[in-house]
């Protein structure tokens, strides 16, 4: 087996080249962010203080086809835009930042925000949005 997955090299390498603040890239398949990525509308609405932090700050990549080869990597990098978080439809998330600490902070608190939203949805009613 190869030491490093070539799709990971493609995705991370392309993002490092195209996104100036992407000194650190974290990619996970965390439980609640992945659940959010599987929803028909994966946008995270502002329903509490954690979700408000990420309102309109998350890019969504709906074209994820399963493997990040060169063309897919270019599309993903372009989808990040000015966001620090990219939600990959039916897959998980990427966070990008100038430091490991910043990338992890976004990763950790985004997962907490997703947990709140997914838990609220499990009540079977739409959560009340915070008026912004």
Residue ranges and their predicted role:
Residues 1-132:
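Glycine-rich flexible loops
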């Amino acid at each position: 087996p190869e030491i490093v997955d070539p799709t990971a090299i493609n995705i991370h390498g392309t993002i490092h080249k195209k996104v100036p603040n992407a000194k650190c890239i974290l990619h996970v398949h965390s439980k609640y962010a992945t659940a959010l990525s599987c929803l028909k509308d994966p946008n995270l609405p502002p329903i509490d203080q954690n979700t408000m932090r990420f309102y309109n700050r998350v890019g969504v990549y709906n074209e994820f086809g399963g493997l990040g080869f060169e063309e897919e990597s270019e599309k993903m990098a372009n989808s990040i835009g000015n966001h620090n978080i990219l939600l990959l439809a039916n897959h998980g998330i990427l966070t990008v930042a100038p430091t490991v600490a910043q990338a992890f902070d976004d990763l950790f608190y985004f997962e907490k925000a997703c947990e709140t939203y997914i838990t609220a949805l499990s009540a079977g009613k739409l959560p009340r949005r915070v008026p912004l």
